[in-house]
Amino acid sequence: MPTGLDTEAVPGRTARPDLRDPTPLLFIGGTGRSGTHVVSKILGSHSQFRKVPNEARFHTDPGGFPDVLAGRTSPDLFAYRLRHYWWRNFEPARLSFRGLHRYVPKRRLDAATDAFLRRCEGGEPEAACRQLFFDLLWPLATEEARAGLIEQSCDVVAEAGPLAMLFPEARFIHVVRDGRDVAASRVGQARWLAYPRTMQQGLEWWEGRIRRIDAGIRAAGRDRVHEVSLDDLVSGNRRKKTYRKMRQFAGLRNEDAMLGYFTRRVRVRNAHSERWRSDVPVRQHAEVDARYEAILDRLTEDGVGCVELLRRVKDRRDA
């Protein structure tokens, strides 16, 4: 069985002067519960891309690539976690196993990990991380003769600084969603078993995540990142424009499969827009609104880039 080692993406070319070259590597991230899966499915419907089936995470999680490169995690410890956690781990909330094992054969994992350790021992941690990523995931693209790969681990934009250094050919999409809906969704997902447990905690959690992401965008350079509002993508008069700008950022011509998925499947009823109003008692709506407005004010004062998108959605809903 081929291991897929030592294969890398090669940027494509286009003759369209108004269209960027297609990126061979597209990272899509957000706060969590923000719509990254929706955006990745839209763009993953294009013939350019193969979408990684689920979050790979080894390049973004604590103990992953950023910590290896910063010297906070040893290559040996990283390799242990890769083999024993990121490749396959049990998720109690879903009563199922998750991880790379669904699409990375054990033989490929072992060969790629051994090669990673050899490169680290040779004093090349950056090259080791970069090649490990391609060794594990690029075969997904070659299996379907695709020229590019989409990866949607939640923290890819928050960790855009080190990832942009490792992958200079990559671009990033930050998916933004109304913070009240994100907070309500996250609280519902936690089911009182973990933080955040209340709407107030949910908004605090969301603000912290947004700030981490903005720091990642600054580290990578704003020209490498496109911010897209899920709320604009599913409803309103900016829907088509939002889709077009996102497509152009990735360097994609329109295709029937991608446009068809967008027009048929990406709708407001599927996005659970304003779900917070049904999740939160009516008597608490004014308090939640006030807290959210205060957060947006703080983010504006600190120059956080996505606030314009968030305010536009809020103003449209308040009108």
Question: Model regions: which residues?
Answer:
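PAPS-dependent sulfotransferase catalytic domain
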Residues: F116-Q131, L136-A257, E274, S278-D279
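Conserved catalytic segments around the Walker B and adjacent sensor/switch elements
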Residues: R50-P53, H226
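PAPS-dependent sulfotransferases, especially Golgi type II membrane carbohydrate sulfotransferases
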Residues: M1-F27, V187-A190, D214-D223, E227, ...
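P-loop (Walker A) phosphate-binding loop of NTP-binding proteins
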Residues: G30-T31
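A conserved segment at the C-terminal end of the G1
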Residues: H37-F49
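Catalytic beta-strand/loop signature of glycosyltransferases that borders the donor
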Residues: V52-E55, M258
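PAPS-dependent sulfation machinery
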Residues: E55-L149
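Anion-recognition interface
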Residues: F78-F97, H101-K106, V157-L163, R197-R211, ...
